[in-house]
Amino acid sequence: MSEYNAQDYKFGQPRWCPGCGDHFFLGALHKAMGELGIAPHNIAVISGIGCSSRLPYYMNTYGFHTIHGRSAAIATGAKVANPDLTVWQVSGDGDGLAIGGNHFIHAVRRNIDLNMILLNNRIYGLTKGQYSPTSVRGFVSKSSPYGTVEDPFRPAELCFGARGNFFARCVATDLASAVECLKAAAKHKGASVTEVLQNCVIFNNGTHESVYTKEGRAKNAIYLEHGKPMIFGENREYGLMQEGFGLKVVKIGENGITENDILVHDAHCKDTTLQLKLALMEGPDFPIALGVIRDVEAVTYDEAVHAQVQEVKAAKSYHNFSELLETNEIWEIK
């Protein structure tokens, strides 16, 4: 059992709007850290700019509230400089996928050992309600008064397209699932991306309404667990089967279909084909996938950097800057 609990990671009084999804997520993060049992002084929480990026102020850990869109780059430096540090990088959909989109995909591609959290409310909240890279087509906002005329990013596609090895999704109001996703992300060696679906009660309330309540998730979501059949529904009466190159929803008990016919989730499969199809499912025809969708191990960037440094040092006659200066002839200028 961990010697720490959620209280050990709490600090300050959050200043988010009442009902903001950030409150729910913060509670899940505190609880996950308590169960992981990592000492607060061995954790750094690094954020960019936005409502969600105030999160480091409410953590009794090291933290850095950085600049717009650059938290992944700064988190990279922290992790490479101190590989023993557990680094959480937190951003919203605007901060993380617009100005920070390039840093996001390259941190994932490099497989830096970062726990990357994307709080997705499909809106710019701090700047008072402009559409973001994840806002749906036709969304009316202060910066799109007649509706957007572009399709949104889907975070899972970005992660998979950048050759990501870990992707999970949870809902801010679902404490148990969020805690399990965060713990799995922390235990994963390499870049882990966890998308957190949450509402902005002021500027985009109800954007994830179909899965924001327990009753809604029972009807409209599927919880994926590695090695378990993909079954869902209020009475676990539906399942997923393969149809051609796609998926289909079937009702267990009809047309001779049993639980044995249902696809089994394999989060550890290196091939992303089925995992991506699961991550991109959406209503009303399919349930929204929650839980750990992909979890594959690979060599991390920070490990490779330090291994290379040691290899080069071993082959050189000098091992630090001082020795380098003294390697060749030295003269004194008077």
Which residue ranges define each predicted feature?
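Short coil/turn connectors at secondary-structure junctions
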Residues: 12, 39-43, 81-87, 109-115, ...
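Glycine-rich beta-alpha junction loops
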Residues: 49-51, 121-123, 174, 197-202, ...
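Thiamine diphosphate
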Residues: 49-125
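ATP/pyrophosphate-binding catalytic subdomain of soluble kinases
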Residues: 168-223
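Active-site diphosphate/adenylate-binding microenvironment
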Residues: 6-67
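Conserved thiamine diphosphate
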Residues: 3-4, 84, 132-185
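Flexible, low-complexity linker and terminal segments
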Residues: 2, 11-12, 202-334
